[in-house]
């Protein structure tokens, strides 16, 4: 395979894995540990 193809595949895989990790952090098990600043400030 050509170098440009390998680089494009690598960057695509990196982007997909980063997006998957971000979604897991936002909506998966670690999301229970996130704090909500809007709930902390009661007016």
Curated annotation (Swiss-Prot):
Family classification: Belongs to the PsbN family.
Transmembrane parts of this sequence: 7-27
Broad class of where this protein is predominantly found: plastid
Membrane topology reported for the UniProt record: Single-pass membrane protein
GO cellular component: chloroplast thylakoid membrane
Biological process (GO), any one: photosynthesis
Protein's cellular compartments: Plastid, Chloroplast thylakoid membrane
Name of protein: Protein PsbN
């Amino acid at each position: 395979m050509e170098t440009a193809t390998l680089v494009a595949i690598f960057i695509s895989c990196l982007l997909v894995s980063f997006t998957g990790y971000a979604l897991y952090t936002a909506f998966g098990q670690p999301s229970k540990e996130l704090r909500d600043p809007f709930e902390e400030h009661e007016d």
